[in-house]
């Protein structure tokens, strides 16, 4: 008899753009068939966090996550790097993960010179802090530099995802003195299709979803 698929708890994904839904659904189908994803989208969370700072959305975030848990989610994955730290420290009784933590750990493992690229300025500081946190956790030295890819976010918001990705790829290809390039936002992932640099270009959706899947299997009810 074929092996039964491993049981897992539903995963609620908190997005600040609906564009992330097909990305994570495709990764689920390719890497984690049978994993139940429940998508929550609130674009205003990012807009407010950009205006007032990530902590300004803590109350709304807690309410959304508590609602997802009340409806049966066993794990929450926040796919927005700007508010990821706020989400991660929200106690709703189930694991709350930020999508970019596994990517940050991989960047630290690649070497001490890490370049963070972002298309939204509010993402730079949280991502740099995360890489530095992972370096302390690993006991490794790290030098993190950060750069904003100008005009790319406007293209993304206008629906020109390829145009955004190509600008990000150009910025990545201009980096030569690094051991890893971190694409700070999940929305930047497709830039990997256009890069030619020999420096590893890391994105968050695949390793982030893998971490959520592991947590979902661990949280599944027995039987």
Give the positions of each predicted feature:
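Non-catalytic structural scaffold of enzyme domains
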Residues: 1-223
């Amino acid at each position: 008899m074929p092996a039964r698929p491993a049981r897992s708890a539903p995963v609620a994904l908190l997005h600040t753009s609906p564009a992330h839904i097909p990305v994570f659904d495709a990764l689920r189908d390719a890497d984690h068939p049978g994993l139940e994803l429940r998508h929550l989208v609130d674009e205003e969370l990012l807009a407010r966090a950009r205006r007032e700072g990530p902590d300004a959305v803590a109350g709304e975030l807690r309410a959304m996550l508590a609602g997802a848990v009340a409806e049966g989610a066993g794990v929450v994955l926040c796919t927005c790097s700007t508010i990821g730290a706020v989400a991660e420290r929200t106690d709703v009784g189930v694991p709350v993960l930020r999508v970019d933590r596994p990517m940050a750990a991989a960047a630290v493992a690649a070497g001490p010179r890490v370049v963070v690229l972002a298309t939204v300025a509010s993402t730079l500081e949280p991502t740099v802090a995360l890489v530095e946190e992972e370096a302390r956790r690993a006991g490794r030295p790290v030098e993190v530099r950060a750069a904003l890819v100008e005009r790319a976010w406007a293209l993304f918001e206008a629906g020109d995802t390829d145009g955004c990705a190509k600008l990000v790829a150009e910025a990545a290809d201009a980096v030569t003195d690094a051991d890893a390039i971190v694409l700070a936002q999940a929305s930047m992932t497709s830039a990997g299709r256009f890069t030619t640099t020999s420096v590893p270009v890391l994105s968050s959706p695949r390793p982030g979803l893998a971490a959520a899947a592991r947590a979902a299997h661990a949280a599944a009810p027995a039987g």
